Amino acid sequence: MLPPKIFFEKFKEIIWPIERKELKLFIPMALMMLCILFNFGALRSIKDSLVVPSMGAEIISFLKLWLVLPSCVIFTVLYVKLSNKLNFEYIFYSIVGTFLLFFLLFAYIIYPNQDIYHPNDAMINNLIASYPNLKWFIKIGSKWSYALMYIFSELWSAVVINLMFWQFANHIFDTAKAKRFYPVLGMIGNIGLIIAGSVLVFFSSGQYIIDSELLTDSFNSSSCNSIILQPIISIIVTAGIIAMFLFRIINRFILTNAINVLDVKKAAARTKTKLALIESIKLIIHSKYIGRIALLIICYGLLINIVEGPWKAKIKELHPNTIDYVNFMGMFNIWMGISCVTFMIIGSNILRRLGWLISALLTPIMLSITGFIFFIFIIFIEEIGTCFGDFNLLYVAIIVGAIQNILSKSSKYSLFDSTKEMAYIPLSLELRTKGKAAVEVIGTKFGKSLGAFIQSLIFIIIPTATFDSIIIYLLVIFIVMMNLWIWNIIKLNKEYIKLCK
C-alpha cells in the first residue's frame, strides 16, 4: 500500500495535473472556455427549440446543407483574408462581437416583431400545396429569422470554439503541455453545459407565468418575450463579453510575462503569418496529413447528423411545443455536462497513460455501440412493444437516443477534441493556422452537410418521407462510415508518430 503522501500526489496527478506556476495562465483559459461552452450549450438548445417544433425535425437537414455549409465557406474565405491583414487578437474581438450583436438584435428586435417580418401562414400553405417537392425550402422562407438564428448558433461552435479558442490554445501549448492541459480545460469548460442547462430549465419551467404554448404564438405578448428569450440571450451576451475580457487579460498581462510557462518558440508562434488565399488552399489540398484530420471531423459530423435527426423527430412527438422542448433540452444539457465532466476525468488519464491511438479510437467505438442500439430500437420498436404492453415506448426511444447522444458526445468532447487538437501541434505554423481554419470550419460542417444532403435529397424526391420511413437506409450508411472512420484513425496515428519524432 502506498504511503498517504505518495497516494495523494498520484491522485493529484490524475485529477489535477496542472503545476502551481501554470495556474496564472490556466485559470483564465479555463474560465474563458467555460463561458464559450455555456453559450454553445444554450444556443444549441435554442436553435433546435425554434426550428423543430415550428418546422419539423426534417428541416434540420436542409438548414445544414443549404444555409450552414455555404455560410461556413464564406466565413473561411473572410477569415483567411483577415488573418493576413489583422492581428489574431483583433480578429477574435471582431468575430465574437459580431455574434453577440446579432443575438441581441434577434432577441430584442426581430423575434418580438416576427409577425411583421415573416410571411403569413395562408400564403405559405398555398405555396406548399402548389410546390410540394419544395415544401421544406418554403418552410425555411416562412421562418427566415429562425433559420438565421440557427446559422449563427451553428457557427458559434465551428468558429468560436473549434477555430478561435483551440487555435489560440495550440499557439500557446506544446504537445507535452497539451496532454495535461486539454483534458482538464475541457472538464472545467463542460461545467458550462450544466450551467446552460440549468438556466434553460429555470426559464422554461415558469408554467405558473405562461401557458406551455408554442413560443411563436405566445410571443405576441411582450411580457412573455422578456420572460423566456431575452433573459437567456442577455446571459449569453454577458458570457461572451466575459470571454473577450479574459482573452484580453491573457494577451496583455499573462503571455508577455509567461516565459516560465511558455518557451520562446511558442511565444514567437503568436506572430502573424502571411499567406495568400490560393496558396493556403493548395497547401491544404496537397497535405495528406491535414486531409486525414479533415476526414476525422467529416466522419464524426456525418454520423452524428444521421443519428440526431431521427432522435429529434421523436422528441417533437413527445414535446410538440417549444417551451417543453426547451425544458427537455435544458435537462439534456445538464446530463450532458455531468457526463462530459466525468469523461474528462477518465479521458485525461486515458490520453496520458494509453496514448493517442487508443484515445482517438474510443470515440468511434462509443458512437458505434450506442448508435447501433438506438437504430435497432427504432426499427424494431413495434416488436419490442409487444414485450412491454402499454409501456410508453416513445419515451423509452427518446431516452435511448439521449443516452446515445450523451455518451457519444461526452467521449467526443473528452477524447476526440483533445486528440484532434494534438494532431495539429507537430505541424508548421502555416499549416496549423491556415489549414486549421479550413479544416475546422469547412470540415466540421461538410460532415454534417453530407449527411444532410443524403437526407434532404430523399425528402425532396419523396415529400411524404419521414425519418421513420428511411431509418433502415440511415443504418446502412452509419455502418459504412463508422468503418471508414476507424481505418482513417489508424492511418493518421502512423503519420502523427513520425511527425512527433
UniProtKB/Swiss-Prot annotation:
Main location: membrane
Keyword Protein biosynthesis assigned: no
Location(s), subcellular: Cell membrane
Claim: Hydrolase is one of the keywords in the record: no
UniProt-recorded Gene Ontology molecular function terms: ATP binding; ATP:ADP antiporter activity
InterPro entries registered for this protein in UniProt: ADP_ATP_car_bac_type
Transmembrane segments: 23-43, 59-79, 90-110, 146-166, 183-203, 227-247, 293-313, 326-346, 361-381, 383-403, 446-466, 470-490
GO cellular component term, pick one: plasma membrane
Membrane topology listed for this record: Multi-pass membrane protein
Domain of life: Bacteria
Keywords: ATP-binding, Cell membrane, Membrane, Nucleotide-binding, Transmembrane, Transmembrane helix, Transport
Family label: Belongs to the ADP/ATP translocase tlc family.
PANTHER family linked: ADP,ATP CARRIER PROTEIN 1 (PTHR31187:SF1), PTHR31187
Described function: Provides the rickettsial cell with host ATP in exchange for rickettsial ADP. This is an obligate exchange system. This energy acquiring activity is an important component of rickettsial parasitism.
Record's protein name: ADP,ATP carrier protein 3
Organism, as annotated: Rickettsia typhi (strain ATCC VR-144 / Wilmington)
Gene name per UniProt: tlcC
